[in-house]
Amino acid sequence: MDTLLERFLRYVTFHTRSDATNPACPSSEGQLVFARALCDEMQQMGLSRVTLDEYGYLTACLPGNQPDAPAIGLIAHMDTADYEAAHVVPQIIENYQGGDICLGKGDEVLAIRDYRFLKNYLGQDLITTDGSTLLGADDKAGIAEILTAIDHLLAHPEIPRGDVWVGFTPDEEIGRGADRFPLDRFPAKWAYTVDGGELGELEYENFNAAGATVRFIGNNVHPGTAKGSMINSQTLAARFHAAMPTEQTPEATDGYQGFFHLAQMNGTVEETCLHYIIRDFDDEGFAARKAQLKERVASLQLEAPRARIELTLTDSYRNMRSQIEPHMHIVELAKAAMQAADVTPRIKPIRGGTDGARLSFMGLPCPNLFTGGHNFHGKHEFIPLQSMEKAVTTLVELVRLTSAWRG
């Protein structure tokens, strides 16, 4: 699949880092530049109803050859995470034979002691960074895999298929990917995001997510005359965070365990803000975490009545499991497609969110499929080419199997 590798290496040269501080959609001009290039490519491929709107949402259709088959969607996002993403220079480690991988010309290393799963890829071709940027496999690998699968279906009209809708979204990494998704021009019965990790991942559960800002307002007085009058908001914030459960943080949890994560803090004597993210798979656990924060704020306010402590909670997205379970055939079809591609399905929860989570609540059930990548959002990101090829085969098999499904 030379075209797959060529596509991916071309796509990662586009600088598409999203910008959470910019309220515009898309939040960065590079995403529109990439979207226009993809739009041209899809038109040249011969897809129908190729549409790129002012917000950077790109949709197209591969018409089916089975009139009664359900229409499905394949979705990926164009932006990359909040990490250095300009001037990406991939390196290809052909026929990996084990051991550490030097990244570029510096001292950065993809070390086997840190990533023991590297041993699973002996003899394969690994695409890595040069140690100075992320790679962008999240989610340009998904885009390359989708379009390569579409290429294969175009070249093999004997493969039965219903309509296949393709959607590429902006700003997924900053939680806005579904904000303006054009469902009116995306008439799929259900869809799949191709935005997962290692080979075989199949996900239809994700975190419930919220953000919490705790604002501490104190009283700044000259420190030489501060006795009895200064209220140092930073001290209060430190007390607050020190009382948070250390066993319920991202670095101490996995699987179905939720957490509180102090993502950012800034402050002065007068005013300090702590910005947390709250994650839990269980609805009751999610509600309990938010209640726990409220109780902690109220308790500290009683201890420091001369200060003012304010809590703002904002829900971000919800666990899509409740929206997928009434349509479990779409998960079973994905499992069968992986097995047909000689891939072992690995059903696991997403310790994060995807566009598909919100789209599922908008009426488009949307589980998540693997891309094959590892270590997303940083300089140690890499992806095995053979896993990408398996993703393409899985998508082709998914289209074929879905063409025979009648609900």
Swiss-Prot record:
One Gene Ontology CC term in the entry: cytosol
Alphabetically ordered keywords of this record: Aminopeptidase, Cytoplasm, Hydrolase, Metal-binding, Metalloprotease, Protease, Zinc
The reaction(s) this protein catalyses: Release of the N-terminal residue from a tripeptide
Active-site residue numbers: 79, 172
Subcellular location per the Swiss-Prot or TrEMBL entry: Cytoplasm
GO BP annotation list: peptide catabolic process; proteolysis
UniProt cofactor(s): Zn(2+)
Cofactor note: Binds 2 Zn(2+) ions per subunit.
PANTHER family reported for this sequence: PEPTIDASE T
Stated role: Cleaves the N-terminal amino acid of tripeptides.
NCBIfam families: peptidase-T (TIGR01882), PRK05469.1 (NF003976), PRK13381.1 (NF009920)
Protein's UniProt name: Peptidase T
Classification of source organism: Bacteria, Pseudomonadati, Pseudomonadota, Gammaproteobacteria, Aeromonadales
Name of the gene this protein is made from: pepT
